[in-house]
Amino acid sequence: MKKVIFFSILPIMLVLSACFNDPIQDDLMDYVNKEMLTAFELEATAVSAYDQVSGLNYSDDITMYDALVSTVIPTYNEFIKELNSVPIETSELREIHEIYIKGADLQYNAFVKIVRALETQDPLLIEEANGMLEEARSLLREYQNEIDKLAEEHNVDWEEKDSSTSSI
């Protein structure tokens, strides 16, 4: 008799446990804690290399050119490949991830345009690249805002590892 009761209650328990499982929460946790680690590292390396030769750290065109060609662009290209290969299970997270890819692609193209501008000494190309960087920053902020909103909606709390921000 106990077996009959147990086996008749078991399917109900399994259905109830499935109700408590949030696939978006699971996908988001996996995304941040596992799938994006390599991408985050590659992005940090590329952006740090760019930050070291731009803005207040700018010294001359040759130094910037060398950093872009030898480190920033190749590393950022690997970052974009990694972004494109991240497995994502839910459409909600996929839509947000696509914003990240769009911003990263735009930033990569801006870096390439800066190299062309330095090679040709064309100030108009620099202006175009700076506009592209600004638009990329906007997309990357949108990504961050949307990922934060999704996390909040699905009860995911972030633990900040590094509070430094890029100047890009």
PLM features per residue range, with description:
Residues 1-4:
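Positively charged n-region of N-terminal signal peptides that target proteins for export
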Residues 15-18:
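C-terminal motif of bacterial Sec signal peptides marking the signal peptidase cleavage site
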Residues 20-22:
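Bacterial signal peptide processing site
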Residues 28-104, 111, 116-118, 123-167:
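Alpha-helical segments in soluble extracytoplasmic regions
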